[in-house]
Amino acid sequence: MFSTSDQVSKMNSRILSALLILGIATCVIAGGFCPKSRHPQCNLSYKINDCCAQSDCRVGSVCCVEGCGNVCRAESDTPLGEKFVDGSECKHGHVFPKKWYQFW
């Protein structure tokens, strides 16, 4: 037969396992926020995209939309900037605006 201490031990290990899984899931989902944009306005006639997905950035960084293109920035605790949405239209590198004759 099981003693009361064995039952308590099993219950404690289940609770700790559940808390561990919850903690890991929270870290994976949290993702972080973009800090305030350094350059909200861009004086260039083109953009330079360093990232086109969150996976393009290192751990602890987030792909953020800036005035002159998307860049990887260190995560912030507060949502002050604009985070790039995975799946949005994006092209890596220098992106020039279309000329009038390229729209057709």
From Swiss-Prot:
Subcellular location: Secreted
Keyword Secreted in record: yes
Classification via InterPro entries: Elafin-like_sf
Biological process according to GO: defense response to bacterium
SS bond list: C34-C64, C42-C68, C51-C63, C52-C90, C57-C72
Signal peptide: 1-30
Top-level lineage group: Eukaryota
Function description: Has antibacterial activity.
Family: Belongs to the venom protein 11 family. 02 (wap-2) subfamily.
Protein name per the record: U20-lycotoxin-Ls1a
Protein source organism: Lycosa singoriensis
